[in-house]
Amino acid sequence: MSLGVLAAAIAVGLGALGAGIGNGLIVSRTIEGIARQPELRPVLQTTMFIGVALVEALPIIGVVFSFIYLGR
């Protein structure tokens, strides 16, 4: 196993770990906000989905960079 494959696996794994933690924090804070002010649910959910999408973009970019690196 080459070091390039190991580096790509670590990059993808850490990206997924960070995204999982970030998504958990985003969703938990959104639920807390909805519990405090239920009338703001639509606004908070919209903001949550945008935040989750931005956080999920990072592991996808990591996978793409790993494939590009391994393709060389």
From Swiss-Prot:
An example molecular function term from Gene Ontology annotations: lipid binding
An example Gene Ontology CC term for this record: proton-transporting two-sector ATPase complex, proton-transporting domain
Membrane-spanning residues: 1-21, 48-68
Residues annotated as signal peptide: none
Keywords: ATP synthesis, Cell membrane, CF(0), Formylation, Hydrogen ion transport, Ion transport, Lipid-binding, Membrane, Transmembrane, Transmembrane helix, Transport
Location relative to the cell: Cell membrane
N-formylmethionine found at: M1
Pfam families: ATP-synt_C (PF00137)
Gene3D superfamilies per UniProt: F1F0 ATP synthase subunit C
InterPro entries: ATP_synth_csu_bac/chlpt, ATP_synth_F0_csu, ATP_synth_F0_csu_DDCD_BS, ATP_synth_F0_csu_sf, ATPase_proteolipid_c-like_dom, F/V-ATP_Csub_sf
Membrane topology category: Multi-pass membrane protein
Residue(s) at site: Reversibly protonated during proton transport: E56
Record family assignment: Belongs to the ATPase C chain family.
Complex formation: F-type ATPases have 2 components, F(1) - the catalytic core - and F(0) - the membrane proton channel. F(1) has five subunits: alpha(3), beta(3), gamma(1), delta(1), epsilon(1). F(0) has three main subunits: a(1), b(2) and c(10). The alpha and beta chains form an alternating ring which encloses part of the gamma chain. F(1) is attached to F(0) by a central stalk formed by the gamma and epsilon chains, while a peripheral stalk is formed by the delta and b chains.
Note: Dicyclohexylcarbodiimide (DCDD) binding to the active aspartate residue inhibits ATPase in vitro.
Role summary: F(1)F(0) ATP synthase produces ATP from ADP in the presence of a proton or sodium gradient. F-type ATPases consist of two structural domains, F(1) containing the extramembraneous catalytic core and F(0) containing the membrane proton channel, linked together by a central stalk and a peripheral stalk. During catalysis, ATP synthesis in the catalytic domain of F(1) is coupled via a rotary mechanism of the central stalk subunits to proton translocation.
Protein name: ATP synthase subunit c
